[in-house]
């Protein structure tokens, strides 16, 4: 796997990730989240049609159900879910973080009870890598401890240094396997800890680097200051992945600072709650004002949903709890995110990213009438 930066506008990077099989992902890119080997409600063909180039799978959930062995028997996650474009799998670290009240964390790994059937599970860096090898995703992640917010300096330091030790164990377990292992920078909101983490991971010479431990409750300005502090220490010739950060404005600010890859459940989860993203801000479809509104969600949008259906119809589907409503909303929200990344790539190519960002914020403030 190679990363090629084709042009920059300030710190914003327009590049591409070239995989060993010849597949190419244009960056900056948003990765829809397919937690259970599916992006909820959509077929792989629908994902492809709306422009998704790479998706994310969840190691934690797939390990527990159906199990890595079943997916491996299909030939891997691509064949299991019939998605032929690249897949990135996370390590399970964030899900372990979310089980804070019922898990025990040690140097060896994380011990917890399965939220599915209650059986005890022991997840180590080596086990996470083995599961991801069985899933056979294109990009795999080291197991890390997602540092909570708030955390004291000492708590963040101890957590970050254990994640570094786990990164070394992950690399050793990975060996020369064909998948591409990314390291995860931790350190809370402490700039010196983030820099220490990044510099130590760079010594491992991994194919890519993720910024983890953000979008866990910290203020927006603290998140952006953390990115400003750490990104100069992350190699320019490798892809940079900001994990779990997903509001549209967060994507713009991440790209502005040199991030190449994003993922978040927000567009698909919000779609199922009739909370829709548009060029002019949020549209809350459950509002009664949309009962008789004949316009599409966004008159500037070319997605399948906006080209065919009215706000009134989608409002009706939501009121009736019809599955089609959630599906059409998800198509729109994911198209919005994918198209936003396309617009940012073009703005970087044309060296007008700052103008794009100003227009983005101005339009978002207009609101939907």
Swiss-Prot record:
GO terms for cellular component: cytosol. GO terms for biological process: queuosine biosynthetic process; tRNA wobble guanine modification; tRNA-guanine transglycosylation. It is an enzyme of class 2 (transferase). It comes from the Bacteria. The active site is at 90 (proton acceptor), 263 (nucleophile). Pathway: tRNA modification; tRNA-queuosine biosynthesis. This is Queuine tRNA-ribosyltransferase. It comes from Dichelobacter nodosus (strain VCS1703A). The lineage of its organism: Bacteria, Pseudomonadati, Pseudomonadota, Gammaproteobacteria, Cardiobacteriales.
